[in-house]
């Protein structure tokens, strides 16, 4: 072996070692988070317990890994959830509210129970005819995310460039899109912005696969879920706190449903202008909120994760969206200055998309619901109100064919299950090959 061959071989080994170390570093970031107790997070941020009603952080710490030498961002592709909103319909509030009214009619409320009922009346009045509407907090979340995008990637959003925005035909998504676009325009008036909300794009913007949905709660999944939740539902302490004779009101108050939906009512309030009034949330202990999180987290995994209890296919509900993202990117990267493509939708799209991509290990496959917490499958971290996945593309100039892509989950660098020697950057050719193969295999098995 010549000296040149030895040097080349050594260089290659160092490159592979560096890639392995970087991949391990980014994986450990995720594992480090999962090592924390969820209860500790909930004690600081009770909204975390509500899973898909979690609050988007007021500030995000930017810790950006420098791209390989000469590479610069040139295109952004994105899918984001609408911002904070009111509860979609009054049913979730009516369940605990009507139970409390019935107990009150029987004179069975304690002084604490009477105070809680007054708080519930206040929330019901504030929410009436606002079901599902975006709140002022929701608008601000998208303005802030847009500002951050410009601040971090001025190469993409500076000067006279194009921003194409699409949303589902749901009002809160359209308003989220409008808030973000207005903020971008205010920062850079030269932007060429177009917005669209059309039924023609709903096939990939908000695809709800009926066949997959039918197979979510298989007998095996239902048995496992019921066993998992049996030891976590209910709240005798709460019943004794609010009702004079819990045994009597047991006939009109379903303990498990009451506990669950009263918690939701209090936590949802954190998204509205009543967010300074945390009385309903404060009546629950951190452990009680934690148990509710466990119940919800397991259900979201069954419904949208790669859960072995129902075949592990649920993330493929977003196969059309992923194909569209790939096709759009392939088209855009041919341009000298492709700009930005933003999409605004829902958490029932974003969560399975994250699982389909395997971002930060969310492609976890298990039939043991007790594994979720220790493995770091925490849905609250994926889809708070305003959550987003950003694909940032890099190259040296428009002639550069070696395009790289980096993924941000809620504005933080994330990992993918793809080999790379420059994590968290991945070759676009590898990205395409990996995911198109995955999607094609699924289509063949259908």
State each model region's role.
Residues 1-38:
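Bacterial Sec-dependent N-terminal signal peptides
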Residues 36-162, 168-341, 345-446:
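Signature for phosphate-centric chemistry
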């Amino acid at each position: 072996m010549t000296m040149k061959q030895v040097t080349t071989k050594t260089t290659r080994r160092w490159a592979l070692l560096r890639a392995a170390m970087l991949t391990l570093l980014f994986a450990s970031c995720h594992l480090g988070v999962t090592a924390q107790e969820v209860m500790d997070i909930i004690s600081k941020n009770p909204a975390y317990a509500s899973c898909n009603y979690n609050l988007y952080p007021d500030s995000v710490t930017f810790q950006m890994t420098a791209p390989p030498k000469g590479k610069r961002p040139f295109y952004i592709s994105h899918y984001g959830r609408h911002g904070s909103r009111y509860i979609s319909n009054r049913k979730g509030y009516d369940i605990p509210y009507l139970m409390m009214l019935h107990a009150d009619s029987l004179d069975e409320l304690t002084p604490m129970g009477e105070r809680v009922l007054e708080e519930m009346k206040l929330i019901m009045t504030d929410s009436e005819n606002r079901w599902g509407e975006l709140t002022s907090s929701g608008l601000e979340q998208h303005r802030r995310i847009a500002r951050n995008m410009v601040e971090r990637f001025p190469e993409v959003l500076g000067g006279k460039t194009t921003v194409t925005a699409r949303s589902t035909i749901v009002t809160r998504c359209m308003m989220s899109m409008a808030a973000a676009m207005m903020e971008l325009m205010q920062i850079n008036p030269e932007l060429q912005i177009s917005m669209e909300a059309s039924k023609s794009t709903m096939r990939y913007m908000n695809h709800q696969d009926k066949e997959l949905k039918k197979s979510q709660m298989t007998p095996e999944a239902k048995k496992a879920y019921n066993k998992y939740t049996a030891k976590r539902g209910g709240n005798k302490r709460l019943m004794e706190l609010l009702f004079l004779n819990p045994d009597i009101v047991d006939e009109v108050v379903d303990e498990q449903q009451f506990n669950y939906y009263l918690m939701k009512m209090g936590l949802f309030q954190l998204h509205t202008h009543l967010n300074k009034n945390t009385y309903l949330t404060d009546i629950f202990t951190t452990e009680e909120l934690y148990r509710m999180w466990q119940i919800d987290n397991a259900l979201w995994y069954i419904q949208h994760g790669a859960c072995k209890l129902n075949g592990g296919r649920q993330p493929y509900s977003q196969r059309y969206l992923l194909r569209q993202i790939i096709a759009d990117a392939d088209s855009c990267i041919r341009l000298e200055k492709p700009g930005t493509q933003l999409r605004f939708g829902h958490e029932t799209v974003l969560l399975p998309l994250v699982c389909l991509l395997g971002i930060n290990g969310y492609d976890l496959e298990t039939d043991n619901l007790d594994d979720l917490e220790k493995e770091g499958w925490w849905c609250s971290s994926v889809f708070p109100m305003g959550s987003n996945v950003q694909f940032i593309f890099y190259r040296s100039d428009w002639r550069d064919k070696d395009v790289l892509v980096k993924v941000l989950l809620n504005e933080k660098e994330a990992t993918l299950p793809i080999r790379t020697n420059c994590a968290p950057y991945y070759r676009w050719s590898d990205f395409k090959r990996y995911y198109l193969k995955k999607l094609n295999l699924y289509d063949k098995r259908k």
